């Protein structure tokens, strides 16, 4: 059984019922969901890292180092999107999901589109 670690930018305290963070780089934390065979195996949280320690790519590298394979986001700039592509993390667009649970369900149902440059923003809070 191969599992996938999915990161979802979230508001405090995180978890499946937490609201999604509007912008990946400025979220309170990431809810990490381990998925295998279409089921949630585990849920954990990971604090975000300050931008000062590596700029916009600090969160990208932080998530790559812990083995995240997929990120579901509602918003991000072009630079971090390119960074995720470079480190091999697939980025999906949250497509209006309000909670982590809704985002994960969208992923499991194949309803989340690839996060393309059409979804990028100029950065900052949403």
Predicted segments with their positions:
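Mid-chain, well-packed structural core segment of small domains
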Residues: 60-96
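Non-catalytic interface/targeting segments
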Residues: 1-54, 86, 92, 96-126
